Amino acid sequence: MSPRRTLPRPLSLCLSLCLCLCLAAALGSAQSGSCRDKKNCKVVFSQQELRKRLTPLQYHVTQEKGTESAFEGEYTHHKDPGIYKCVVCGTPLFKSETKFDSGSGWPSFHDVINSEAITFTDDFSYGMHRVETSCSQCGAHLGHIFDDGPRPTGKRYCINSAALSFTPADSSGTAEGGSGVASPAQADKAEL
């Protein structure tokens, strides 16, 4: 009987890890919500229209899953009361009361206005596992969510300023238009 040949243990472990990561990436492309494939979104805009309406940075972040530079976004240090919305379709996402300074360099929130407004997708880019957040109405990339936020949720929605628009609260303390989706005619091109 000849001796059984096996791979050296470090190589065997490395191959097993690679196989697990590939399987996780393949299976992890599943998401909660239904709007990662732009064809299934409730609100759809042509790429031509989005390039006209959005700044180059807004387009890069929301349509190409880009990330703006840390500490340079319009809303990083923003403290006014109001509602933060998706810059692409106007869906209300976050209240200013849930915004906090995480020190990360991006606007951070510990809760969303409506849990159905955001889609969560596993993201295995850059050799790590994160959870991407996208607008569930139009599929715009917003940022990522982490489990290191403050109470009561323990969540940190780390969101690119370029993915947001802001509606200030009026004198009665409520934000204008906090419940609707902006039409393309209503959405102004925001300059960052």
Swiss-Prot record:
Widely expressed. One of its GO terms (cellular component) is endoplasmic reticulum. The modification N6-acetyllysine is found at residue 42. The gene is MSRB3. It comes from Homo sapiens. This is Methionine-R-sulfoxide reductase B3. Binds 1 zinc ion per subunit. It comes from the Eukaryota. Belongs to the MsrB Met sulfoxide reductase family. PROSITE patterns: MSRB. Its cofactor is Zn(2+). Zn(2+) binds at residues 86, 89, 135, 138. Residues 1-32 form the signal peptide. The keyword Lyase does not apply. It is an enzyme of class 1 (oxidoreductase). InterPro entries: Met_Sox_Rdtase_MsrB (IPR028427), Met_Sox_Rdtase_MsrB_dom (IPR002579), Mss4-like_sf (IPR011057). It holds the Pfam family SelR. Residues 169-192 are annotated as: Disordered. Keywords: Acetylation, Deafness, Disease variant, Endoplasmic reticulum, Metal-binding, Mitochondrion, Non-syndromic deafness, Oxidoreductase, Phosphoprotein, Signal, Zinc. HAMAP family: MsrB.
